[in-house]
Amino acid sequence: MSRVGKLPITIPEGVKVGLNDLEVKISGPKGELSKTFKGNIAISLEENKLLVKPLAANKNARAMWGTARSIISNMVTGVKEGFKLKLEINGVGYRAMVKGKYLNLMLAKSHNTKIEIPSDIKIEVPKQNIIILEGTDKEKLGQFASIIIKQRPPEPYKGKGIKFENQFIPRKEGKKN
């Protein structure tokens, strides 16, 4: 039995939930999210609580049970409070700036890297080496952050690169003569 899946999702005030078979639409003060789930689970709304239940006893249904519950819980949190990720850029001459709908990264390459900002994600660059991402969809926010990090992942010798704010980068010792 899934320990995550069996917990009910409490719907806070100001958040509206719409169910249409396996499609869940959640709207709140920060925006609206919708997601369609595959079979093997049943989603029901009872007394301001969402319940997710498996329809079969096989391994796939049990796996989707906990996953669907976590995704719906993140959707509720996203439309109510939103999510925020902070990225740090370490390295001499490494910078970030927002120009229109593009994030412009200068990462010691022969060219500047331009990344188009998705419409549902807000980017703030308070300093040249800090990027703050905000959005309602946790999955899209993490995906966009990984696209940014992929441009210059942190390296273990000098620690240069883009990383999450509190991410620990294990350091290696250089060559010995």
UniProtKB/Swiss-Prot annotation:
Keywords: Ribonucleoprotein, Ribosomal protein, RNA-binding, rRNA-binding
GO CC terms, sorted: ribonucleoprotein complex; ribosome
GO molecular function: rRNA binding; structural constituent of ribosome
Pfam families: Ribosomal_L6 (PF00347)
PANTHER family reported in the protein's UniProt record: 60S/50S RIBOSOMAL PROTEIN L6/L9, LARGE RIBOSOMAL SUBUNIT PROTEIN UL6M
Record's function text: This protein binds to the 23S rRNA, and is important in its secondary structure. It is located near the subunit interface in the base of the L7/L12 stalk, and near the tRNA binding site of the peptidyltransferase center.
Protein name (database record): Large ribosomal subunit protein uL6
